[in-house]
């Protein structure tokens, strides 16, 4: 596993790290509270695709917010570097986890399973990139995040046919929120509290997709 600098980029100030940790700590609590409602709703539907999809989505959300909270709360050192790798890897898992209820619960069939396989293959590649390669560049990782997120455009036609307008709005709003936040993620070394702003966009995107899954994919 490659070594990351103890104080990446310019480093976040103590105040920034506190706000970063609190923001995603709140997101973690919300995810833990919201998950039972999501799972119970899927179970009531009695559909295996919905149950698996919502379970994977929920687990990926909890993992991301837990990893992020621990990373930003931990003091500089070896453990913090490890949490940073886990946090960045969890972004790939969250993206794939968000696809899962859509591919298994809504799209289904050969197309749904193919997209499911492709997106999880990319997620595994992204995790390996973060964990094992010294040459892993943040720009490459960010581009892969965006590629995975917007790969869903190939499914626009079947989604239009199987999802109401409100569901498509939530799907798009969540994707646009994540994408807009990437600008602050990429420039947080130059923008004070830019990483906090990124976190707020992530929370907004997750919220949109939570209600998308609750109302239309479970």
List each language-model region with its residue ranges.
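Multi-pass alpha-helical transmembrane bundles in non-GPCR membrane proteins
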Residues: 1-218
């Amino acid at each position: 596993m490659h070594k990351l600098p103890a104080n990446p980029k310019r480093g976040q100030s103590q105040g920034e790290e506190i706000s970063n940790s609190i923001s995603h700590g709140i997101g973690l609590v919300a995810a833990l509270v919201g998950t039972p409602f999501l799972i119970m709703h899927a179970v009531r539907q009695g559909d295996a695709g919905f149950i698996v999809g919502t379970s994977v989505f929920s687990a990926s959300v909890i993992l991301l917010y837990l990893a992020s909270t621990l990373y930003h709360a931990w003091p500089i050192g070896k453990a913090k570097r490890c949490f940073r790798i886990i946090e960045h890897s969890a972004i790939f898992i969250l993206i794939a986890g968000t696809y899962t209820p859509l591919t298994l619960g809504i799209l289904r069939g050969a197309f749904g399973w193919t997209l499911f396989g492709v997106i999880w293959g990319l997620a595994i590649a992204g995790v390996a990139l973060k964990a094992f390669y010294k040459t892993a560049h943040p720009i490459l990782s960010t581009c892969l995040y965006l590629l995975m997120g917007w790969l869903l455009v190939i499914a626009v036609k079947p989604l239009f046919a199987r999802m109401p307008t409100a569901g498509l709005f939530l799907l798009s709003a969540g994707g646009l929120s994540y994408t807009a936040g990437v600008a602050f993620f990429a420039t947080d070394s130059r923008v004070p509290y830019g990483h906090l702003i990124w976190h707020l966009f992530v929370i907004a995107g997750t919220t949109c997709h939570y209600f998308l899954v609750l109302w239309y994919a479970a």
